Swiss-Prot record:
Protein name in the entry: UPF0337 protein SAG0606
Region (Disordered) location: 1-23
Entry similarity comment: Belongs to the UPF0337 (CsbD) family.
Pfam families hit by this protein: CsbD
TM region(s), chain numbering: none
Organism: Streptococcus agalactiae serotype V (strain ATCC BAA-611 / 2603 V/R)
SUPFAM superfamilies assigned to the protein according to its UniProt record, in alphabetical order: Hypothetical protein YjbJ (SSF69047)
Biased composition range(s): Basic and acidic residues: 1-10
Length: 66
């Protein structure tokens, strides 16, 4: 697992914890902040996955052109 992917997973977990704590305590602001943090981290993870897929595809094309 790449460093970026690991960081995204940690941020997702942190966001989930904040969101859950906000729900539990009735703190709508904390709940919203947690949701946003979790969602942004998931987006970063998906972008990293897409980057990896493109890099792999480029490598395959390069090998076929040799």
């Amino acid at each position: 697992m790449s460093q970026e992917k690991l960081k995204s997973k940690v941020e997702q977990a942190s966001g989930s914890l904040k969101e859950g704590a906000g729900k539990l305590t009735g703190d709508k602001e904390l709940e919203a902040k947690g949701f946003v943090e979790k969602t942004i981290a998931k987006g970063k993870e998906l972008a990293d996955d897409a980057k990896d897929a493109v890099e792999e595809a480029v490598d395959v094309v390069k090998e076929k052109l040799k």
